[in-house]
Structures are given as C-alpha cells and as structure tokens.
Amino acid sequence: MRELAPAKVNLCLYVGPLRADARHELVSVMQSIELADRLELRDHDGPADEVRCEGVEGPNLAAQALSAFRELTGWDGPPQLLEVEKRIPIAAGMGGGSADAAAALRLLARRSGLGSEQQLFEIAAALGADVPSQLRPGRVLAEGVGDRLTRLADPPPFGLLVLPGAGGLSTAAVYAEADRLGLGRSTSELAVALAGLDTSSPEPVNDLERAASSLDPTIEDRRGRALEAGATHAMVCGSGPTVIGLFATPEDAIAGARALSRVGVDARASKPLATSE
C-alpha cells in the first residue's frame, strides 16, 4: 500500500500567549501542497514493526504513529514495514514529520480495516500539534494549539516557491526565542486577528518570523531571493527556516524556481493540493 504525505505551509500564523501547559495558542490557515513524501506499507518478514527512512536516524513520528495505532485499536496484524521516501526538507517548518505520521495512520486504517475518524484524531493529537490538520490534506483553519480545526474550501490556483535552509530549526527553539523576544500576542489581540481573518486570502503574517530569523540569519537573504524572482510576498514557513514565495499562478512560480536554480539557489516550485486529491 502506498500513500503520499503532503507538506503544509502556514499562509498565516498568529501566535498567542504561552499557556500553563507550556504550549501556545495560535490561529493559522494551513494549506497542503503538492511537495510530498512517499510512504509504502507492507507485511514485514522481521519480528516486529519497522520504519525505514533514509537520512533520518532515531525515533520518528511515523514509528510512534504505528505503535499508537496498534495500542488504541487493538490491531494484532502481522509486523509491518513502513518505508518513507523523504522529499520534504527535514526540520524545515513544513510539517514533514507530521505529514508522515498522518499518512502512516491513513495507511494503517486501510490495512487493518480499523481506526475510526475519532480514533485517528485522538492518536494524531497525542503525536503533535500539526498532525491532526494533516490527517485530511487540504486547507484548514487551526485554532487552540492546532487541535481545533475547521475545513476550508479549496483556494483558486496559485503558485508557491519553496526555498529550504541549509540546515533545520527546532520548533521548540524557535518558540523559545519568540518568548525571549516577547513576540506572542495577548489573548485579546489573538481574538482580533481571528475576527479579521479572511481565510480565502489571508494576509501573509508569521509571528515566528523574527524569532526564526534571529536563529538563522540566512532567512533574510532567501526572502530577498524569492521577491527578486517575482513573488508577491515572501515569508518564513511555520517555524522555519524554509522561506516560501507566493505567486499569482503555478506557472509564475515555476519560472521563478528556474531563474533561481540557474544561479545556484535551491528553489522548488509547488502549488496547493486540493482536498479531493
């Protein structure tokens, strides 16, 4: 069995105050895009479940998803081998690990015939804030800590330029830097942002951008590169360090990626993934 694990981009990200449980309230419009990891699940001839992901060492969310699925559903099927082909940059603010975990849950539900929508959501929420929103690729409005989701209509076509960083950034480190810089909004300010939000065409705001740029000074150069390539807006994606450029059409984004690639810049064109895809 095979499944795609689409990356996500935060078209806007408003960060609220730090809660008692050390997590932040947020408001974000999240959009799945065509850039995706590829997963394959099959019976394993080994004694236990195994996840293989070239370039990723140690525990990962997909392995945790497999274990949690068995525990919650009681599935006692044969050992499974899950192979992940990475195409989404790692620790890049694009939800690659969360996308893999969500795709693994979809595969396991198909393979076992078990796992209600509520059970999958429960597992996803326990794995991480970004996982529930990626159980069903498309566009969502995320509130709370990313656990209150509202499905949104697919947007008109537009183009995206993805400019990864040379290394990754820890999401926890970026949020800690945001706290140090005092970037979080108050509860009332977050409510104002939500009230004025146009989910069909959100203003490209990322409250974590200053914090990510503080930890990775190369972000500003990549933002400039995206704008030079014709992007109408350029911003940090999620917790970074990836920069995304927004274009009126997918064709414009492809032209921008080609122009940057000619001068040695790692730039990839993509576009939104429709809910039905």
Where are these regions (language model features)?
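ATP-binding N-lobe of GHMP and related small-molecule kinases
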Residues: 1-92, 110-114, 155-156, 164-165
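Short, active-site-adjacent cap segments at secondary-structure transitions
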Residues: 89-90, 169-170, 241-244
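N-terminal pre-core extensions flanking Radical SAM catalytic domains
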Residues: 236-250
